[in-house]
């Protein structure tokens, strides 16, 4: 489905001020506290695809995770694996990548899912059938302004039931690379968006590259 400006308009008007003042006796709050004591904080959220972290780290609702590192460190690859693992748990994901087309992302996901460098035709068809209601892409290349980014996430959460959002990357926002205040505003906007919608947002952020991989990363 193409998302035109008319569809996005109501989502642009939403502000953080629209969050309701709610009673301490709100049934949703009560259920959250029950879950906290009965299940434990570490058991809430989307599992990551590593057994060693199964009971130590989750992609929790209302939170933002920043994947930082130099170019070629595998940030996008890891995020792709997290999306696949989320799908296996029944969570729907949205990938907003200004750096890779949906075709390129799907080609990589097919390799990851099949464990084959060149997946077979049947494997690709089976993956498409499996992923059709689990993984969604925002099909735009180049850059996107922060307001449109937040509007897209709100729209996807409302219309597709998205629970995990990948934004790849911070450097593809419509701003100068040294606009630190602008980058801070984007991170804050995504964190607020995650909290308001009850989704988890993964933000890929590139660090300045040193001479060696072991060099300390600049801010």
Features from the language model and the residues they span:
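Conserved inter-motif catalytic segment of the P-loop NTP-binding fold
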Residues: 6, 31, 44, 89-185
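Generic beta-sheet signal
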Residues: 63-65, 93, 163-167, 199-203
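Well-ordered alpha-helical segments embedded in enzymatic catalytic cores
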Residues: 52, 78-82, 148-152, 186-189
């Amino acid at each position: 489905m193409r998302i035109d400006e008319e569809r996005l308009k109501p989502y642009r008007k939403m502000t953080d001020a629209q969050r309701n003042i709610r009673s301490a006796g709100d049934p949703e709050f009560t259920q959250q506290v029950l879950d906290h004591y009965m299940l434990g904080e570490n058991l809430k959220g989307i599992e990551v695809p590593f057994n060693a972290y199964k009971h130590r780290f989750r992609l929790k609702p209302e939170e933002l995770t920043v994947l930082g590192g130099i170019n070629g460190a595998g940030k996008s690859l890891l995020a792709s694996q997290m999306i696949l693992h989320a799908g296996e748990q029944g969570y729907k994901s949205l990938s907003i990548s200004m750096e890779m087309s949906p075709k390129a992302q799907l080609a990589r996901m097919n390799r990851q899912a099949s464990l084959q460098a060149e997946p077979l035709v049947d494997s690709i068809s089976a993956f498409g059938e499996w992923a059709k209601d689990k993984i969604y892409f925002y099909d735009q290349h180049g850059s996107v302004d922060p307001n449109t980014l937040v509007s897209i996430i709100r729209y996807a959460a409302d219309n597709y039931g998205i629970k995990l959002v990948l934004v790849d990357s911070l450097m593809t926002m419509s701003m100068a690379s040294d606009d630190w205040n602008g980058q801070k505003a984007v991170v804050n906007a995504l964190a607020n968006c995650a909290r308001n919608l009850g989704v988890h947002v993964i933000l890929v952020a590139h660090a300045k590259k040193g001479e060696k991989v072991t060099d300390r990363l600049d801010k």
